[in-house]
Amino acid sequence: PFDFVEGRDVGTFNLAGNVSLKDQFGGIDDFWAECIGLSDSAAGGSVRCVWRSLKGEKAYSVLSGQPLKEGVKVIGEFVGGTGSLKGATGTFTFTWTSTFIDKDQGMFTGHTKDLSGSYQIP
């Protein structure tokens, strides 16, 4: 945690995990995602993610304003990519179905459902 206004939890974080898609995104259905972000219990957060395919292709996304807690619907935006995902744009949503935060260890664990969205690749 970052020493900020009393009663307001602020901190930076890193998240990483598998994104397994039911429908392919640019011909790919399995990614490893890594994200960095700033979380503010009063204002939400700002997150930047890189989704990497097994072949090394990347999709870049931005998430903002949503707290990391169960039941929250997250809205994301694709802002580019590499390889077959170069120039990818679009939006997506998902819902946190379970979350666990261990502030002492600086760990977050979460699971999502209902990942859906639309995209364009030039």
Label each PLM-derived region with a short phrase.
Residues 1-122:
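Beta-strand-enriched cores of mature, soluble protein domains
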